[in-house]
Amino acid sequence: MWVPGFGSARLPQRRRSGLESSSVRPLWLLLLFLLAAVRPVRAWESGDLELFDLVEEVQLNFYEFLGVQQDASSADIRKAYRKLSLTLHPDKNKDENAETQFRQLVAIYEVLKDDERRQRYDDVLINGLPDWRQPVFYYRRVRKMSNAELALLLFIILTVGHYAVVWSIYLEKQLDELLGRKKRERKKKTGSKSVDAAKLGASEKNERLLIKPQWHDLLPCKLGIWFCLTLKALPHLIQDAGQFYAKYKETKLKEKEDALARIEIETLQKQKKVKVKKPKPEFPVYMPLENTYIQSYDHGTSIEEIEEQMDDWLENRKRTQKRQAPEWTEEDLSQLTRSMVKFPGGTPGRWDKIAHELGRSVTDVTTKAKELKDSVTSSPGMTRLSELKSNGQNSRPIKIATALPDDIITQREDSAGAMEDEEHEAAEGEQESATTEARPRRRKSARAAEAVTRVEPEEKLRGKRQKDFDISEQNDSSDEEKQRKERTRAAEEAWTQSQQKLLELALQQYPKGASDRWDKIAKCVPSKSKEDCIARYKLLVELVQKKKQAKS
């Protein structure tokens, strides 16, 4: 049963499939025709090239050369070859060309006896040799050329190619300029104002620079010019090469010298003896107590007893140092005096420099300088205040000895030297003035000092006797003693070992003569004022002076 709507809908699909099949069929037919038209391709072989060369050499028909017909059998060709070989053999033929004729006969026979090569020869007879339109023609010519001929041919080809490339570059630039000129003309006609004058000037310069290739642009001329310029520049090139080689040698020598110097420095550093550090004196370890306000010694003891204990400890320490220090010779003493003149009072680090020159410790040098000063300033008839003090102390009853705490004073070589610097700077000025003054002046000063030392104990004895009878004077003196003791006690209790060390370091850092010295020292010691530092310093100086007076 036919439905009207569906039949009309299917009909166009059938038509499309028929059209598609009709368009594909001609393509298949065209491909088959092309495949059938293609002939088998055969390349030229070495046998073909030898055959072509033989044909050109003989310049005769091979069949005519043997005396046979073209359709002759191989047996007939063999018989003809034997007959001709007997006549053309060099042993029987005395002709000059006998060898070449016999060689050609053998080559012709080799071609005709083989059916395949004979068939190729027949094709040559029909079609002839390859002409100039075939590549094998040129190949056969090139095969016969020598090396020189090949080089010449290659050079000619390169020359022609180079000249053609030069012309192509020139024409290309000319074409670009022509197109650019036309574009500019169009822009001018349209009235566009975007044309830049600089671009126009550059294009005109390029047009002027364009030059047609000349005969000297040929490759042989270029090579000749390059060769001449190379010969001219050859001396300069040789000179530059020599300079470069000399610089290279210098750099190599410098590198070797640097390497040797480094090795020597390393060996010297290895050979250097390790400096033995001097053993630092062992100080008693300070252990802070939980109760910092606990008294470390009996405040009822006098300052003289504390000084005696301090002197005993310092004497024991000095004895050990004296054992280690070498003895002083006359040369050492003269060197000491010269160094003291060289480094006068007020010089920063004076005693360190003097000790460095003498090769001794600072304490050893300062003690010896003090001894020299005492020996110069004192006379045999003088009585020292320290001797009177010691006599007075011996007459007093002995009290309980108390140990001096470590936080009062810290003895070190550097710190002792620094404080002794402060003491001896004034003394050195006296020593230098005493050495420069005349002898009568010394006698006067010695007598005056003697008188002072004699008057002082008398005044003290008188004062003591008056105080025994005068109650007000006794009270005043007791008040003064109490105040002095309270000050010393406050100074002793308030100063810790770390603060004492900081004070000693600050005294070394800011020597005598520095501006705002005590302000800077007070800044270095925490929680201490300028007055505290000065009072502490005075106390330490008094202790050291008393110790030295007792020793002397």
From Swiss-Prot:
Residue numbers bearing the Phosphoserine modification: S379, S477, S478
Segments of skewed composition (Acidic residues): 419-431
Keyword entries, A-Z: Chaperone, DNA-binding, Endoplasmic reticulum, Membrane, Microsome, Nucleus, Phosphoprotein, Repeat, Signal, Transmembrane, Transmembrane helix
Composition-biased stretches (Basic and acidic residues): 453-470, 480-492
GO terms under cellular component: endoplasmic reticulum; endoplasmic reticulum lumen; endoplasmic reticulum membrane; membrane; nuclear membrane; nucleus; plasma membrane
Signal peptide (UniProt feature, chain positions): 1-43
Pfam families linked: DnaJ, Myb_DNA-binding, Myb_DNA-binding_2
Region: Disordered, residue numbers: 370-495
Top-level taxon of origin: Eukaryota
Cytoplasmic side: 171-552
Main location (coarse class): endoplasmic reticulum
GO biological processes: protein folding; regulation of protein secretion; regulation of translation
Residues covered by the SANT domain: 323-377, 490-545
Topology in membrane: Single-pass type I membrane protein
Keyword Signal among record annotations: yes
Transmembrane regions: 150-170
Domain J: from-to ranges: 56-129
GO molecular function: DNA binding; protein-folding chaperone binding; ribosome binding
Side of membrane Lumenal, spans: 44-149
InterPro entries: DnaJ_domain, DnaJ_domain_CS, DnaJ_domain_protein, Homeodomain-like_sf, J_dom_sf, SANT/Myb, SANT_dom
PANTHER family reported for this sequence: DNAJ HOMOLOG SUBFAMILY C MEMBER 1
Physiological role: May modulate protein synthesis.
Assembly with partners or alone: Interacts (via J domain) with HSPA5. Interacts (via cytosolic domain) with ribosomes. Interacts (via SANT 2 domain) with SERPINA3; the interaction delays the formation of the covalent inhibitory complex SERPINA3-chymotrypsin, but does not alter the catalytic activity of SERPINA3. Interacts (via SANT 2 domain) with ITIH4 (via C-terminus); the interaction protects ITIH4 against in vitro cleavage by kallikrein.
Protein name, UniProt field: DnaJ homolog subfamily C member 1
Native species: Mus musculus
Lineage: Eukaryota, Metazoa, Chordata, Craniata, Vertebrata
Gene: Dnajc1
